[in-house]
From Swiss-Prot:
Its main location: cytoplasm. It is found in: Cytoplasm. One of its GO terms (biological process) is threonine biosynthetic process. It catalyses: L-homoserine + ATP = O-phospho-L-homoserine + ADP + H(+). Its EC number is 2.7.1.39. One of its GO terms (cellular component) is cytoplasm. The gene is thrB. One of its GO terms (molecular function) is homoserine kinase activity. ATP binds at residues 95-105. This is Homoserine kinase. It comes from Corynebacterium urealyticum (strain ATCC 43042 / DSM 7109). Catalyzes the ATP-dependent phosphorylation of L-homoserine to L-homoserine phosphate. Pathway: Amino-acid biosynthesis; L-threonine biosynthesis; L-threonine from L-aspartate: step 4/5.
């Protein structure tokens, strides 16, 4: 029989955003970034109260359809606990549908909050597994859970049972910084995936495998390899037609020597480097309505009793 969480129990979660793919590492590499959502969850007598401020305010549902709420419910069920009612407050800074892991952060915050309310009965692997079921891949989720960079993978059993999601952290060189150029437009991951071909030439697959290896060395040991390590032939060339502004800025930045790439499904463009991007370039981006954020590599999700 499930244990009931006492009314009045409250936890606060701080979850970082993330970038996925990082150029060649399609659906496998992720990086936590210092832009955060804050979620407070309190057990109340009955019902559900949802409040959202910041990013997504006035746009996301304030009922059981809210992703954080769905993730909380999944976490409580997995932990075998129940709550009479929930009050959920979300203060969001991660831009939504921009390729910075907002949906993964929501799923992670909900599962982590539920686990904290239950007394921390779920281990890290279970949290990644549970949160990744909302995404269908673990790259952003694992980055938000573990912090730093991650290598992630999915195993799909031949017997048709549910996929299992896995990740391992990668320590990032301390000199690496991130600059995000965030266009004022949304990108649906599903829509942007539709332009990808079902098959790619063996030569291009080999190219991406080698560059993924180079990128891991660049991230952990030798940042001078970041430009070479962020080259890609698997997904970004095909997404250029539906993300023309992003493609323009990726090409402009790379042509000037900056390791730029599409963050996740876009439209955000991310630069990873040890030196700042030239201010004149960033100002031009701002003048064209593109938001610029100077970020650092973030640590893992954190939680505390409120």
């Amino acid at each position: 029989m499930a244990t009931e969480i006492p009314v009045g129990r409250k936890v606060r979660v701080k979850v970082p955003g993330s970038s996925a793919n990082l150029g060649p590492g399609f659906d496998s590499l992720g990086l936590a970034l210092s832009i955060y959502d804050h979620v407070e969850v309190e057990v109340i007598d009955s019902g559900l109260e949802v409040e959202v401020t910041g990013e997504g305010q006035g746009e996301v549902p304030l009922d059981e359809r809210h992703l954080v709420v769905r993730a909380i419910r999944a976490g409580l069920k997995k932990a075998d606990v129940i709550a009479r009612g929930l009050r959920v407050r979300c203060n969001n800074s991660i831009p939504q549908s921009r390729g910075l892991g907002s949906s993964a952060a929501a799923a992670v915050s909900g599962v982590v909050a539920a686990n904290a309310l239950a007394g921390d009965v779920l281990d890290t692997d279970t949290i990644i597994q549970l949160a990744s079921t909302f995404e269908g891949h673990p790259d952003n989720v694992a980055a938000s859970v573990l912090g730093s960079a991650v290598v992630s993978w999915t195993n799909i059993p031949v017997d048709g049972t549910e996929p299992t999601y896995h990740a391992s952290p990668v320590t990032v060189h301390p000199d690496i910084r991130a600059t995000a150029l965030i266009p004022n437009s949304h990108a649906s991951t599903e829509a942007v995936r539709r332009v990808l071909p079902s098959d790619i030439p063996h030569l291009d697959a080999r190219f991406n495998v080698s560059r993924t290896g180079v990128l891991l060395v660049a991230l952990s040991k030798d940042p001078s390899l970041l430009w070479e390590g962020t080259r890609d032939r698997m997904h970004q060339p095909f997404r250029a037609e539906v993300l023309p502004i992003s493609s323009e800025w990726v090409n402009r930045l790379r042509n000037q020597g900056y390791p730029a790439f599409l963050s996740g499904a876009g439209p955000t463009v991310l630069v990873l480097s040890t030196e700042p991007v030239e201010e004149a370039l960033l100002q031009e981006a701002r003048d064209r309505g593109i938001r610029v954020e100077e970020l650092t590599v973030a640590g893992p999700v954190t939680v505390e009793d409120a």
